From Swiss-Prot:
The keyword Transmembrane helix applies. This is Small integral membrane protein 8. It comes from Homo sapiens. The gene is SMIM8. Residues 1-24 are annotated as: Disordered. It is found in: Membrane.
């Protein structure tokens, strides 16, 4: 007697060319000038180049840290010459110690 009514079937139509937009900023309508000034927003990321940049930046930071550590070690040393004329490196001492 009372059977459940069947839900209406919806037909999924494929998106038309004008309606389809790619995700992200690549699908946004922008001017050519904006795309020329900001190409990194519209170009697919290049993972090998990103990895190379990350390694290079890490090595630069490590080298700067190394130079800083070397400079800190040299700051407390000075060249001393004994009575016989031999020179050697000696650590600075404070008069207050």
């Amino acid at each position: 007697m009372s059977s459940a009514p069947e839900p209406p079937t919806f037909k999924k139509e494929p998106p038309k060319e004008k309606e389809f937009q790619s995700p992200g900023l690549r699908g946004v309508r922008t001017t050519t000038l904006f795309r020329a000034v900001n190409p990194e927003l519209f170009i697919k990321p290049n993972k090998p180049v990103m990895a190379f940049g990350l390694v290079t930046l890490s090595l630069c930071v490590a080298y700067i840290g190394y130079l800083h550590a070397i400079q800190e070690n040299k700051k407390d040393l000075y060249e001393a010459i004994d009575s016989e004329g031999h020179s050697y490196m000696r650590r600075k001492t404070s008069k207050w110690d």
